[in-house]
From Swiss-Prot:
This is Ribonuclease P protein component. One of its GO terms (cellular component) is ribonuclease P complex. Belongs to the RnpA family. RNaseP catalyzes the removal of the 5'-leader sequence from pre-tRNA to produce the mature 5'-terminus. It can also cleave other RNA substrates such as 4.5S RNA. The protein component plays an auxiliary but essential role in vivo by binding to the 5'-leader sequence and broadening the substrate specificity of the ribozyme. It is an enzyme of class 3 (hydrolase). The lineage of its organism: Bacteria, Pseudomonadati, Pseudomonadota, Gammaproteobacteria, Vibrionales. It comes from Vibrio campbellii (strain ATCC BAA-1116). Keywords: Endonuclease, Hydrolase, Nuclease, RNA-binding, tRNA processing. GO terms for molecular function: 3'-tRNA processing endoribonuclease activity; ribonuclease P activity; tRNA binding. It catalyses: Endonucleolytic cleavage of RNA, removing 5'-extranucleotides from tRNA precursor.
């Protein structure tokens, strides 16, 4: 049976982890947020979040976006490849409903799960 926890091992924790993702990364984006991915040598995917105050002004909005991103990742982690993902919010993300955000996350997770053509 699959577990759907979001443990510490599923998170990007240090600045070095984030910098590694930004080098040689694959991107999938929308007008509302971008997901950057890079292969890792682990047996599971990991998630990092970047939600700048400049993009989403209120703490409530930033926390909502992060909560929904983590929940979407947690629910899809068993279908995702072994990559490190960084989700970067854009200003218009705060205007979407929870359902719209989940649909968009699912679409981008699926796009990043496909094998590369390169």
């Amino acid at each position: 049976m699959n577990t759907y926890a979001f443990n510490r091992e599923l998170r990007l924790l240090t600045p070095e982890h984030y910098q590694n993702v930004f080098q040689q990364a694959h991107r999938a984006g929308s007008p509302h947020f971008t997901i950057i991915a890079r292969n890792n040598k682990l047996s599971h995917p990991r998630l990092g979040l970047a939600v700048p105050k400049k993009q989403i002004k209120t703490a409530v909005g930033r926390n909502r976006f992060k909560r929904l991103a983590r929940e979407s990742f947690r629910n899809n982690q068993h279908q995702l490849p072994n990559k490190d993902f960084v989700v970067i919010a854009k200003k218009s993300a705060q205007d979407l409903s929870n359902e719209e955000l989940f649909k968009l996350f699912d679409k981008l997770w699926h796009r990043l799960s496909r094998p590369s053509r390169g």
